[in-house]
Amino acid sequence: MKRILLFVLTNLAVVLVLGVVASLLGVNHYLTGNGLNLGALLGFALVMGFGGAFISLLISKPMAKWSAGVRVIDGSGSPDERWIVETVRKLASQAGIGMPEVGIFDGAPNAFATGAFKNSALVAVSTGLLQGMTREEVEAVIGHEVAHIANGDMVTMTLIQGVMNTFVVFLSRVIGYAVDSALRKNNDSQTGPGMGYYVTTIVLDIALGFVAAIIVAWFSRQREFRADAGAARLMGRRQPMIAALARLGGMQPAQLPKSMAALGIAGGIGQWFSTHPPLEARIAALQNAHQD
């Protein structure tokens, strides 16, 4: 729940900041000055919605490094670090993507992949994961993250978030205009948006943002099943990924920052807002999958 909340709040912050800038530039007055211009509003919503989502994507890797305290490694350190880098290199080559940056961060068992582009992503694992799993299980977890990159999940989730943002921005302003018109129906002398418009759009931007987060979380859960299957393919068998998930079931997962939401290995909390399916469901999906 904390991870998806951070995701929602950060995304909303970007969209709201863009909204404030647009208001200062007089965009709202242009949209509503002579009646609601739906065509212009749709264009504005698309720019706002996808702009906010892609800004979040572009800053995801540096934000992830900062928020999780990731230490980037190149394989020149300890034997364990060399093994991690070589494992990422091998799996990335098998998946047909460029070599990601590799990092380690302190904390409870977890891992994540992030970044705007397939060939310049970041894969990071926690010290708790390295200490609590066998190498085969860690390799399966890394395979899961590499599969996220190969599947284009960062861009896919950004596009979905962009669509949801567009819906939020468009609908909140349509309702805001209707509320504002109803409140000042006897005051035809006023032009441009009034207080009712601004208050309504701000409240609905936040409220509808949480509704959109439920939809985004559902899509994220489907991507997790695909990444699990991708890890099994990269490993050549399902058992290492099943074993890693089973072991995670007995561990206390770390909380990932927003920039890794929907991409970490640990399970989420909450039926609607969870970005990850229950570990039991993921294990069952792997066990029931047909292997070539």
Swiss-Prot record:
Binds 1 zinc ion per subunit. The active site is at residue 145. GO terms for biological process: proteolysis. It is a multi-pass membrane protein. The chain crosses the membrane at residues 4-24, 39-59, 159-179, 199-219. It is found in: Cell inner membrane. Its EC number is 3.4.24.-. This is Protease HtpX homolog. Zn(2+) binds at residues 144, 148, 224. It comes from Verminephrobacter eiseniae (strain EF01-2). One of its GO terms (molecular function) is metalloendopeptidase activity. PANTHER family: PROTEASE HTPX.
